[in-house]
């Protein structure tokens, strides 16, 4: 299981028949489940069937299954095959963007930024892209923009999602809209104070007593260079509330990043050393420690 929630449908022998991710609503889940039950062949049998007689339907089905298994390159290949096999059928524009953005954001960087931007534009212009997918597109492009270090990349998608979720049409997506409004205030309007206000409003009830949610808020502040003194204070509270191990290490890392951003490099080193003790098998913290130690040495 690599995503939550992950659904794996198997036969009586325990052989995988289908796999999918996510639970947006009961109707969508039921549609996927019904589709899966209508073809009880195993995934291996589906692959053999496609190899023998390629169809757009099977290409798209295997693409979804591969995407749910985090085989984004395989999924991308099959979505493109589906489009080639049936040029008059669905364009799979959003699904293709989804795979390309995942490849770009992955540790191995298996996709160029230019390719992601091109597929995002195609998805935004496609008539088949749903309102929900338009929201996901804006959210994904915000993450892509952060990695690329260029906030302008997300602006047209965030603006479009804000407009699309106005009024009754956006009511089912009101929680997602709150987050989009934060990005809109920060990157489209350039108003950090308004963005911070909206970010607080977007946090769920009880967030001040949750290590994970305190960490998420503090990390948002760090990423956007907003409200750093309070962010550090809240992240330290998160450390106190966090469970020992990986969770505590993650929050310690957030405090370390904020301290480093505020110029307290020595404290960042000590915090990262604590994170390593909490999660010694995670190589990421060793890299963080080396970075912070280098900062300390350069300031001497």
Model-found features: residue ranges?
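Charged, amphipathic alpha-helical linkers/stalks
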Residues: 31-79
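Alpha-helical adaptor scaffolds
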Residues: 98, 102-105, 138-152, 175-192, ...
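TPR-adjacent "capping" and linker segments in tetratricopeptide-repeat scaffold/adaptor proteins
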Residues: 40-58, 128, 167-175, 205-209, ...
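Alpha-helical repeat scaffolds
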Residues: 43-47, 73-85, 109-127, 150-166, ...
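Register position in tetratricopeptide repeats
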Residues: 35, 68, 188, 223-224, ...
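Non-catalytic, surface beta->alpha helical segment in thiol-disulfide oxidoreductase systems
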Residues: 2-42
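Terminal, low-structured helical/coil segments at or just beyond the last alpha-helical repeat
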Residues: 249, 254, 261-300
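Residues that mark the junctions of alpha-helical repeat units in TPR/alpha-solenoid scaffolds
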Residues: 54-55, 89-96, 130-137, 173-175, ...
